[in-house]
């Protein structure tokens, strides 16, 4: 897949980030992960992001990462494109990007670097080093301490033709509007706030109709139904699902830091597709919270 092909894929449809399966002892469970992807692939996502934030990229080892990407590519070949997460320190991000390209992934999402703040010049050097280390497409992730200005992105796009996407996880409406107006159709734009459905209609109004759904991991039919409602400006369906599921879901998710990932694994277990525990420093949901989530799931997608 060429970078332009990746941009085209990222320009329409619903995206998702599968959780990563672990055994009870925390080791990567390749068989469980393959079975998960086989289950999710037919539901209609435009692409799946392996080893992304929801896939606990931040807790993976250098030896596990290629296994995870290779499992995803092998399982989904001919079914749905696989985009790999890559990030952290520049040299490690390059190692991951090159490993993903070797495994046959169709591109990478370049996630935030680790811990330290950086100037726009430093961010640009980081992105350019990764872009020039691979031939396939790169999507940058605007989130946390990694925040790009339109001017920085414009310079990067001039120098790196394989930079084809911009994912926003900040939620700065003015900043996102400025980016879209500055870059136009040079990039594909993705909404990437946690529980992106809550913000999907607003992002669509800004020219960003594509977003990634975490709940696709356990209620894929409902996730697709909500996406279609946004796509078709069906406000009645959007509001009903926000009322019945997404807003109460946020109350559970917001009970503890790190639950944005933990709640997804809990949901997968509830619907019969368990992925094992989250890795520290994350913590699994409490029994009471799991029952609260199960009740919400029964309202929209009975098990």
Curated annotation (Swiss-Prot):
One of its GO terms (molecular function) is 5-dehydro-4-deoxyglucarate dehydratase activity. Keywords: Lyase. One of its GO terms (biological process) is D-glucarate catabolic process. SUPFAM superfamilies: Aldolase (SSF51569). Pfam families: DHDPS (PF00701). It catalyses: 5-dehydro-4-deoxy-D-glucarate + H(+) = 2,5-dioxopentanoate + CO2 + H2O. It comes from the Bacteria. Its EC number is 4.2.1.41. Coiled coil: none annotated. Pathway: Carbohydrate acid metabolism; D-glucarate degradation; 2,5-dioxopentanoate from D-glucarate: step 2/2. Belongs to the DapA family. NCBIfam families: KdgD (TIGR03249), PRK03620.1 (NF002958). PANTHER family: 5-DEHYDRO-4-DEOXYGLUCARATE DEHYDRATASE 2-RELATED (PTHR12128:SF19), DIHYDRODIPICOLINATE SYNTHASE (PTHR12128). This is Probable 5-dehydro-4-deoxyglucarate dehydratase.
């Amino acid at each position: 897949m060429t970078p332009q092909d990746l941009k085209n894929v990222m320009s329409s449809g619903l995206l998702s980030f599968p959780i990563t399966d672990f055994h009870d002892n925390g080791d990567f469970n390749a068989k469980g992960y393959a079975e998960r992807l086989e289950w999710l692939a037919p539901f209609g996502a435009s692409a799946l992001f392996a080893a992304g934030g929801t896939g606990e990229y931040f807790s993976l080892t250098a030896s596990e990462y290629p296994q995870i990407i290779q499992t995803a590519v092998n399982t989904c070949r001919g079914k749905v494109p696989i985009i790999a997460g890559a990030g952290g320190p520049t040299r490690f991000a390059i190692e991951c990007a090159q490993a993903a390209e070797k495994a046959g992934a169709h591109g990478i999402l370049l996630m935030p670097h680790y811990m330290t703040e950086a100037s726009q010049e430093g961010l640009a050097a980081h992105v350019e080093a990764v872009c020039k280390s691979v031939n396939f497409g790169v999507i940058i992730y605007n989130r946390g301490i990694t925040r790009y200005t339109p001017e920085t992105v414009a310079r990067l796009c001039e120098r790196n033709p394989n930079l084809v996407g911009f994912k926003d996880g900040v939620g700065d409406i003015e900043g996102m509007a400025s980016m879209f107006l500055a870059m136009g159709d040079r990039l594909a734009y993705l909404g990437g706030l946690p529980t992106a459905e809550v913000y999907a209609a607003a992002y669509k109004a800004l020219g960003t109709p594509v977003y990634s759904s975490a709940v696709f991991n356990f209620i894929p039919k409902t996730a697709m139904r909500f996406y279609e409602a946004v796509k078709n400006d069906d406000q009645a369906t959007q509001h009903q699902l926000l009322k019945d599921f997404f807003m109460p879901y946020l109350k559970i998710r917001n009970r503890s830091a790190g639950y944005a990932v933990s709640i997804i694994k809990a949901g997968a277990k509830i619907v019969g597709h368990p992925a094992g525990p989250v890795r520290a420093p994350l913590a699994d949901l409490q029994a009471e919270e799991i029952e609260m989530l199960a009740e919400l799931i029964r309202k929209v997608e009975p098990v």
